[in-house]
Amino acid sequence: MTPNLQIELRRFISSNVVSKLNKFYFENDALLIKGIDVSIGTILMGLYNKAEESDFYSEIVSMIQEDSTFYQEIDFNAGRILSVDDCYRLEGNALLKELFSNKKGRISEMVSNEVGIKSETAREILNFSALLVMSYLRYNLQLIESLKLLLEDQKRDILNSIPPGIKIILGFSCYETVEDKSQSMGRSIFTLFGHNFFSF
């Protein structure tokens, strides 16, 4: 069965994870969730943009070591992050540099502005999201060969989760969405994450 990457990744963002992250950032829970969702979509479209670079997917995923702190804190079978500490602040930064190079700072600021969270929070949840996405792909290495096609197939849905300013930085039109704008705006953040947000 072909996985929906966003749905699979959102499974890991439980209320417990949000609560632990907010010990560092003191943001509104709903805005923090939205920021993570935007960041995950941004990382996925960053990968989409690298599809034509030979071996890029294999190389960036190989940067995730199985003995790394963040990787070991994920129970992939259960779809749970077991513990949240600040290791991602350092571990995720190198991934973002590979993915976005000189656009990294602009994307971080745009996440902050578009979502309504502090600049520091935006920087660090981008690190967190980069590690989550790459760790998921590291665990599911069989997806690497078909990742380009997966991202192409899911491109419009992913773009729906990304605000216009970030789309422009990534090189996409603001109108590259699959839903009518009013329908998309009316979607509840909590619905995006399903029941898992309320599970511990």
Task: Name each model-derived stretch.
Residues 1-200:
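A structural "flexibility-hinge" signal
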